[in-house]
Swiss-Prot record:
GO biological process: DNA repair; DNA replication
Family: Belongs to the NAD-dependent DNA ligase family. LigA subfamily.
Metal-binding as UniProt keyword: yes
Gene3D superfamilies: 5' to 3' exonuclease, C-terminal subdomain, 6.20.10.30, BRCT domain, DNA ligase/mRNA capping enzyme, Helix hairpin bin, Nucleic acid-binding proteins
HAMAP family recorded: DNA_ligase_A
Name this polypeptide is given: DNA ligase
Naturally occurring in which organism (per UniProt): Citrifermentans bemidjiense (strain ATCC BAA-1014 / DSM 16622 / JCM 12645 / Bem)
UniProt-listed CDD domains: BRCT_DNA_ligase_like (cd17748), LIGANc (cd00114)
EC number: 6.5.1.2
Reactions accelerated catalytically: NAD(+) + (deoxyribonucleotide)n-3'-hydroxyl + 5'-phospho-(deoxyribonucleotide)m = (deoxyribonucleotide)n+m + AMP + beta-nicotinamide D-nucleotide
Gene that this sequence comes from: ligA
């Protein structure tokens, strides 16, 4: 391939991969398989390696991280990134509104338009686009000078490397907040603890630590997101107001928090704040208040700035989620992977409306670093529905009777050997028959997100283990009505309901069973990827690490953990027993060499003779792929009544269109 052809191919591959990224991550409608995507990605990387001068500045290969840097360079912001003045009460906001009106010479009856947005608890950054391309990304730093973290920011899928507009401004500087959503944060911390690494105290610390990695490949593995909220220096486009700016940049694919709103006057601000307070615990990310800004930029210029903050904006903070209490005891707790965690038993205290009586101390290294002792007076923090944590010891309140909990020399439950693997902070029980591990494994297996065995709660599982009616998850399926009738307050109807729930779990999806097994580093999302890729437990158990890492989003650490799980004879015996007891996960295996192998179908319109799900399964059983949108790679569009734009696009592209009867005939 000559250089001209290589340049054209690189441009096409970059555009095509970015399109597939949007389909996969934003619309959940992939058009190609992981293997096909990986082939495109590999080809682009190889071409860029052969012709490095042809690599585009917004190449999707930049999202997986570049070479590690020795240290961060300093970047001066185009305009200062100022702090915000804080408000804590309704009166503070009313006073703020009064000040705005006085400065602007407005009467008390006149209303100012304010833009309100959730105050993200993340890391402030600045993105600089030149002629539509992301040129520089930096942290806030001291407000005047920050650290250049462009390569790390490029790994965040929410950030466009090129603005999606035919006429980009010559210069666009955007400020935003990088954050780690709560569910990925919990999963990330769980994986760190299982790997023997110290967990992050909160999502903000995790986001900050991820952004400041010298190796951007590490940042790329962390599910960071961003919301942008303000312009810096701009050239080539004129925004009239904050709301004008925030309604324009999403059309260029720059993300803005959808909860941002223009409200009329101070009452609008008060109503918005109360609404966000109610929504706070239901949001998938942490917020710690509301930011209020005068909307019109002309008014902002008139109001000006103080030395450290603009006059035209204020941050109204939520009430603290912290409280002071006493550590009554510190108790070691054994998890399903054998990790022993110190847990603080607290004098019950109300933290933002929730009674807290326990808090994780994570591990002994963390507990020793914070110097937490029995009898200490401590500050406890609760963030969303994240497990409460001890964030500070009030050393000045010590009486001298406080005691440390030493690292256990034996498992506190089974008395088995305890080890500390080099490079890990976790202390682990390695006893194969540890009942505490068995309890946690069975709890996890029966949980709603796993096998969903209704009625099989912690106390009941504990009793089953104590009576030796079960020893592992497979034994659940041996249980009989007679076994259940041994328990107090267990009537015949309740026993029947439990047995029905256990029986129903035998037909759960394969991904649920994979997740339920509690394989280290395998969460719900990874379990779905594995189920889709391998189609059966037998295929997964036989997979090599190389085959596992060929799946997008499965890295070497996860692959090694899966392979190790299936090397264990004890685990294989449990799987054999599950199969013997009739646990038969729902699997739709693709037919190799089926009549639709390599073919892509799109279904549109109102289907009368089958549902979309039924049609999708029919196609997949014959080796085909059902996509959500029409492209040049679509082979067939099956059109029902009132088919719309997808049918039009199919006709434009010359894709073969089938009726429902045509499709059923093709299936014969």
């Amino acid at each position: 391939m000559d250089k001209t052809a290589a340049a054209q191919r690189i441009k096409w591959l970059s555009s095509e991969i970015e399109r597939h990224n949007r389909l996969y991550y934003e619309q959940d409608m992939p058009e190609i398989t992981d293997a096909e995507y990986d082939a495109l990605f590999r080809e682009l990387k190889e071409l860029e390696a052969s012709y490095p001068d042809l690599a585009l500045p917004d190449s999707p290969t930049g999202r997986v991280g570049g070479r590690p840097v020795a240290k961060f360079t300093q970047v001066r912001h185009t305009t200062p990134m100022l702090s915000l003045e804080n408000a804590f009460t309704e009166k503070d906001i009313v006073d703020f509104d009064d000040r705005m009106k006085r400065f602007l010479g407005l009467s008390g009856a006149e209303e100012i338009g304010y833009v309100c947005e959730p105050k993200m608890d993340g890391v402030a950054v600045e993105l600089v686009y030149r002629d539509g391309l992301l040129a520089i990304g930096s942290t806030r730093g001291d407000g005047l000078v920050g650290e250049e973290v462009t390569q790390n920011l490029k790994t965040i899928k929410d950030i466009p490397l090129r603005l999606q507009t035919e006429e980009p401004p010559g210069l666009l500087t955007v400020r935003g907040e990088v954050y780690l959503p709560l569910e990925p944060f919990r999963k990330f911390n769980q994986e760190r603890e299982e790997a023997g690494e110290p967990p992050f105290a909160n999502p903000r610390n995790a986001a900050a630590g991820s952004l400041r990695q010298l190796d951007s490949k590490i940042t790329a593995k962390r599910p960071l997101s961003i919301f942008c909220y303000a312009p810096g220096e701009v050239d080539g486009v004129a925004f009239q107001s904050q709301s004008d700016f925030l309604s324009t940049i999403p059309t260029w694919r720059i993300p803005v928090n959808p909860l941002t709103r223009l409200v009329p006057g101070v009452q609008g601000v008060l109503d918005y704040y109360n609404e966000m307070m109610e929504k706070r615990d239901d949001l998938p990310y942490e917020i710690d208040g509301v930011v209020v800004k005068v909307d019109r930029f002309s008014l902002q210029r008139d109001l000006g700035e103080k030395s450290r903050s603009p006059r035209w904006a204020i941050a109204w903070k939520f009430p603290p989620r912290q409280a002071t209490t006493v550590v009554n005891d510190i108790v070691p707790q054994v998890g399903r992977t054998g990790v022993i965690t110190p847990v603080a038993h607290l004098e019950p205290v109300n933290v933002s409306g929730v009674m807290v009586s326990r808090a994780t101390l994570h591990n002994w290294e963390e507990m020793e670093r914070k110097d937490i002792r029995r009898g200490d007076t401590v500050v406890v923090e609760r963030a969303g529905d994240v497990i409460p944590a001890v964030v500070q010891v009030l050393v000045e309140k010590r009486q001298g009777s406080e005691t440390l909990l030493p690292v256990p020399q034996a498992c506190p439950v089974c008395g088995g050997e305890v080890v500390r693997i080099p490079g890990e902070v976790a202390v682990r029980c390695v006893g194969l028959n540890c009942p505490a591990q068995a309890l946690e494994r069975v709890k996890h297996f029966a949980a709603r997100r796993a096998m969903d065995i209704d009625g099989l709660g912690e106390k009941f599982i504990e009793q089953l283990l104590n009576l030796k009616l079960i020893r592992n998850v497979a034994d659940i399926y041996r249980l009989t009505e007679e076994d259940f009738m041994q328990f107090e307050r267990m009537g015949k109807k309740l026993a029947e309901n439990l047995l029905n729930s256990i029986a129903a779990s035998k037909e759960r999806e394969l991904s649920r069973l994979i997740f339920a097994l509690g394989i280290r580093h395998v969460g719900e999302h990874t379990a779905k990827l594995l189920a889709s890729a391998f189609g059966s437990m037998e295929n997964l158990a036989a997979a090599s690490e190389e085959e596992l890492t060929s799946i997008r989003e499965v890295g070497p650490q996860v692959a090694a953990s899966i392979a190790d799980f299936f090397k264990s004879e004890e685990n294989l015996e449990v799987l054999r027993e599950l199969k013997e007891h009739g646990v038969n996960p729902r699997v739709e295996e693709k037919r190799v060499g089926g009549r639709f192998t390599g073919k892509t179908f799109v279904f549109t319109g109102a289907l009368e003779k089958f549902t979309r799900d039924e049609a999708k399964k029919m196609v997949e059983l014959e080796g085909g792929h059902a996509a959500g949108s029409v492209s040049k790679k679509t082979d067939y569009v099956v059109a029902g009544a009132d088919a719309g734009s997808k049918l039009d696009k199919a006709q434009q592209l010359g894709v073969r269109v089938l009726s429902e009867d045509d499709f059923l005939e093709l299936m014969q």
